[in-house]
Design a protein with these regions (language model features):
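Short, hydrophobic/aliphatic alpha-helical segments
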Residues: 37-57
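Single conserved hydrophobic/aromatic residue that forms the stacking wall/gate
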Residues: 1-7, 11, 200
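Short, surface-exposed loop/turn segments at secondary-structure junctions
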Residues: 84-94, 133, 176-180
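Transmembrane signal-anchor/signal-peptide helices with a preference for the extracytoplasmic
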Residues: 77-85
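Amphipathic alpha-helical interface segments
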Residues: 115-188, 192
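Long, contiguous binding/interaction regions
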Residues: 8, 12-41
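A structural-propensity feature for long, helix-poor, extended segments
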Residues: 85-128
């Protein structure tokens, strides 16, 4: 079973979803009404929100963040390489790689929030009324649409992470040799994000 499905099963009484209100049930909404984006939280707040009783953020958001950290390390190595003494002729090469890496990092950070939003949409779809056949039909259609969107998020995380592997490979071959351990950590972060995203599909 996917992590998302396990979350749903953890709610023992499905009728409980009928009263699902993200403003009162999603912990980060309760903590900060004006600043809901996970990407704007501090590291400590993000960790505390993740460890709370709220089912979101969950594995999908963590996968995206793991990939973002890997991409960030790759960008760091490109910056260190671009400014390495004696490598002035390589500045443009590493700068272009760094720019691409920043775009990847930004996209993965966005996916942290998109995954949590997708899960919240599923919960809201389940909370729709089902008193008549028409309401049940509309509810089912919304559940299907929300679930499809939720599945597409980990696909996107994997796609973006594969792009970052190209950058990491270049840093391993041509980057500052003093940063090779950082390149290794970047690679493992991104590979972990890919494998973790696969779990959610």
């Amino acid at each position: 079973l996917s992590t998302r499905r396990q979350r749903q099963m953890c709610i023992r009484d499905r009728d409980e979803l009928g009263n699902f209100d993200p403003n009162t049930r999603i912990i980060e909404y309760m903590i900060d009404e004006k600043n809901r984006n996970l990407s704007n939280k501090s590291l400590v707040d993000f960790a505390n929100i993740t460890s709370s009783e709220s089912p979101a953020p969950g594995g999908g958001s963590i996968s995206a963040y793991c990939g973002a950290l890997g991409a960030s390390l790759a960008v760091m190595v490109s910056n260190l390489s671009a400014h390495k003494r004696g490598w002035d002729d390589k500045w443009e090469y590493f700068s272009k790689i760094g720019e691409k890496g920043m775009l990847i990092q930004s996209k993965l950070i966005d996916l942290v929030d998109e995954d949590t939003d997708a899960f919240n949409s599923i919960m809201q779809a389940y909370s729709m009324p089902k008193n008549s056949d028409e309401e049940k039909k509309i509810r089912d259609l919304n559940i299907q649409a929300a679930t499809k969107n939720a599945i597409e998020i980990p696909y996107e995380i994997m796609k973006v992470c594969f792009d970052s592997l190209e950058i990491i490979k270049k840093m391993a071959i041509k980057g500052n040799p003093n940063s090779i351990t950082d390149v290794g950590v970047a690679m493992h972060c991104v590979k972990a994000a890919i494998n973790l995203s696969l779990i959610h599909i």
